[in-house]
A protein has these predicted regions:
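Structured alpha-helical
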Residues: 1-100
Length: 100
C-alpha cells in the first residue's frame, strides 16, 4: 500500500464504464468508502460502497477511479477490484492500485 495512504482514510469511488453503448451525457455516480486494512502484494481492503443506505456491489475485475482523502492531501488513482467478501457485518472488497 502506498505510504501516503493510511488505514481509516476516506475515499471516493467512481466506476469506469468500459461498454461502448454508454451514454456520454450520463453522469457517473461517486460512492463513499473507507480504507480498512493493508492486503497482500500492495493491495488494500476497503468497505463496499454504500449509496442512500444500500450497498453497491462491485464486481471482481471492475475498474475504478479512486480519490483518497489523506493527511498528505488528495490522491487519485485507478484501481481494480480483485476480491470481495463479508467479515462479520461488513462487506469488504480488495482493490489493487493500477497507477501510483
Amino acid at each position: 500500500m502506498d505510504e501516503r495512504i493510511n488505514i481509516g482514510d476516506k475515499i471516493d469511488i467512481e466506476k469506469i464504464e468500459t461498454r461502448l453503448s454508454v451514454d456520454p451525457k450520463r453522469k457517473l455516480q461517486v460512492y463513499g468508502s473507507q480504507v480498512l486494512d493493508e492486503g497482500p502484494n500492495d493491495s488494500m481492503y476497503v468497505t463496499m460502497p454504500i449509496h442512500e443506505g444500500k450497498i453497491i456491489p462491485l464486481s471482481v475485475g471492475q475498474e475504478l477511479n479512486v480519490t483518497f482523502f489523506s493527511k498528505s492531501g488528495l490522491l487519485q488513482s485507478r484501481a481494480v477490484v480483485i476480491g470481495r467478501f463479508k467479515k462479520g457485518t461488513l462487506f469488504l472488497m480488495e482493490i489493487q492500485l493500477l497507477t501510483p
